[in-house]
Amino acid sequence: MAEDRSPEPDADVCIVGAGPAGAIVAARLAEAGHDVVVLDAGPRFDLSEREEQLDAHLRPGVEGEASGGGGVDGLWGMGGERDAYTSSGSKGYPLNAARVKGIGGSTLHWQGMVMRLHERDFELQSRHGVGADWPIDYADLRPYYAEAERELGVAGAADNPFAPPREEPHPLPAFPPSHSDSIFADACEALELPMHSVPNARNSEPYDDASACVGYGTCKPVCPSGAKYTAERHVARAEAAGARVIDRAPVQRLDHGPDGERIEAAVYATPSGEEHRQEARAVVLACGGVENVRLLLLSASDAHPDGLANSSGAVGRYFMDHCFAGVGGRIDRPTRQNHVGFNTSECHALYDGEDPLPGVKLEFLNYAGPSPVIEALHADDWGDSLLDTLRESYGTHLAVGALVEQFPRAENRITLDRSTTDDHGNPVPDVRWSVGPETRQAIERVNEVQRAIFEELDADIDWVVGPDGTGPAFHHMGTTRMGTDPAESVVAPDCRAHDCDNLWIAGSSVFPTGGAMNPTLTIAALSCRIAERLDSWLG
C-alpha cells in the first residue's frame, strides 16, 4: 500500500526541512498543541541499517542496499539528478560531499561539536570595523543557548578560559582528553596555548533514552549506537506530540496570496509524480543555507520578481563557510587514537584578538592516520612485510587543525543555474565561493602556530593545509541574513521575513557573520527562540 503523502487539512505551521532547525521547531510547537506538518525532500533512514552503513564506510567496495556505496555521500544516498548543483566561484565547492537530504538532515553524518559563538561574533563591525553586526547580541541568545544544550544533550565542562559567560553547567560531563591530547599538552603549555575540552552533542553517559558513546570511532559519517545526537530525536518527539512528518516530499515553491504579503501554501511533489499544496497559517523554511535560498528564488512571482522575500536583493548573498587550516605528521611514539572519532580538546586563545583578522579555533585532531584496510588494499607487499608497513603507518600520526572565519562578502552567493535542472525540471543551485585576503592571512598565521606545536614536539611534518589548499568545513551560512533594515537584510531579528508576514526562516542562513565556531548549537538556540515567538504569534 502506497504511503499517504496527501496534504494535512487545517495545519497551523508547515515546516520545510527535518534537520535540526526544523525538527526542534516542530517538536516544540507540536508539544505546545499546534498542528504541525513537516515536509522533507529526502527519505527516512532505517535505524536498523546503521550497522550496514558502518560496514560500507569501513570496507571500501562493500555496498549495501541502504548505503548506496562506501563514500560519505553514498552512505546517505546523495548525488544524481535530485541533488545536482553547479559551482562557478574561484574555488570549486563540493556541495554534496557533506550534506544529507533526509529525516535528520546533516546531523545524520556530522561530527557533533557544539560550542557557543563568542560575544565578539555578534559585534564584529562595531568592535573591529569589519564584517557585520547581528541585530541581537550574546545576552539575547544566552538563555536559548542553555535550552539548546539541554535539547541536544551536550557534554562539556567550564574549563575554557576564553568562552563567553554561562548560566548553568552543561547537561553532561565532558569527554576526557584523548591520549594524543596529552601528547600536545606540554607543547601547548610551553607556547602559552591553553587546551580545554570540546562541547560535544554526544552522550558521555546515558541521556534522553540513548546510550553513552561506546567508541565506534566513525561518528562522521555514521554513529551506529545512537549516542551522537541526530535531529531524528526531535522528529520522534514531534510525531509523538501529533505532528505529521512527510518524507520524499520536495517543496517546489511557496505560493502567496494576491498582495504577496502572506504565504498560502507550500507546493510539494511526491514519488508518484503528484503535486500537492500544503496550506498553513505560518511557514518555516529550515532546509539549509543553500536550499532555503533556492526555494525563495524558485518562488519568484509578479509580486516578488527577484524571488520571495528578496526586496533587499540579499537572498543568496553573503554566503560564508569556515575554512580549514591544518598541519599533520608523525611522532616517534604511539598516539593510540584508533578508538576516537571526534575531537576532545581545542584552544580558543587565537580567537578574540584586538586586530580585525578573522577568528581562529585550534582543533587537536584525533587522527590515527590512513585506514589500515585501505592501506592494505593498495599495498604492494604481503605477509610480515605488509604487517610491518601497517604498524609503521598507523597509530603514530598527529594533526592540528583549525576552523578559520570568513567575513561576509556580497560576491560569495547562491544563485540559480538555469542551464542545469534537477529531477523535477527546476534550476539547480549554483555556489559561487572564494576565499578573501583577510582569511588567507589568518590561515597563514595559524599555520605558523601549528608548525610551532610540531617543532616543540620534535615531530615530523608530512602535510600542511594552507591558504592555497584550504577548503570548506561545509557550514553553509549567511544567505538570508537577519537585520533591522529591510533594505539590507532578509529577516528581522525574530527570523521572520521582512517581506512576508507569516514566513520564518530557521538555520544558519540567517547568520550575519559566522565566527569560527561550529554553527549547530547556534542553529538550535535560534530554533528554540523561533518556536517561542511563533507559539506566541499563533496564539
Residue ranges of model-derived segments:
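Glycine-rich loop(s) and the adjacent beta-strand/alpha-helix scaffold that form part
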Residues: R28-E31, D35-V37, A41-A56, A240, ...
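A glycine-rich dinucleotide-binding beta-alpha-beta segment and adjacent secondary-structure elements
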Residues: G79-R82, S197-A201, Y207-D208, A212-V222, ...
